Regions:
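Acidic, low-complexity mobile loops and tails
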Residues: 2-65, 98, 102-134
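Small beta-strand-rich domains/subdomains or short beta-sheet motifs embedded
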Residues: 18, 52, 70, 75-80
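Conserved hydrophobic positions within beta-strands
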Residues: 23, 69, 78, 83-86
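Residue-level recognition of beta-strand microenvironments
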Residues: 26-28, 72, 89-92
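A short acidic/small-residue loop/turn micro-motif
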Residues: 41, 74, 94-95
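Charged, amphipathic alpha-helical coiled-coil/dimerization segments
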Residues: 83-88, 95, 101
């Protein structure tokens, strides 16, 4: 596991995932692929109070805003790093947004998507760790 070193916090960056520079992770080793936000993103959010999830069946393109996170600090859009069709959404995370903060790489996933492209253009764990370390 890579770690992004910050003077205040060490963040987990699991090596088996791929990342966008928008702080979204993708696990394309499972079908449909799983998508969520990184630990770094959850640190930036502060306390999440509401998550607006996409609808199952929605076709998304890379770069589309597909979900919204409302926190004590701001409302932030989740920008999809991949194109495809949303197959599942994590209603448990919508019901209790703290799941995303507490376990962003596990129970806090946001949606599962059937990918259009078998090889999306994403960052490795090491590449992403360098971005958040800067």
């Amino acid at each position: 596991m890579s770690e992004a070193n910050d003077s205040k916090v060490n963040l987990d960056v699991p090596e088996h995932l791929e990342y966008s520079d928008e702080h979204v992770w993708v696990d394309s080793s499972v079908e449909p692929a799983m998508v969520g936000v990184t630990e770094y993103a959850t640190e930036q959010f502060g306390e999440l109070v509401y998550i607006d999830l996409p609808e199952v069946g929605t076709q998304v393109e890379t770069g589309d805003e597909v979900a919204e996170f409302e926190s004590s600090k701001a409302v932030t859009a989740l920008v999809s790093p991949v194109a495809g069709t949303i197959r599942y959404v994590n209603n448990e995370a919508a019901d209790d947004p703290s799941i995303v903060t507490d376990d962003p790489y596990g129970e806090g996933w946001i949606f599962k998507i059937e990918l259009e492209d078998d090889e999306p253009d994403l960052l490795s764990a090491d590449e992403y760790a360098k971005i958040v370390a800067d």
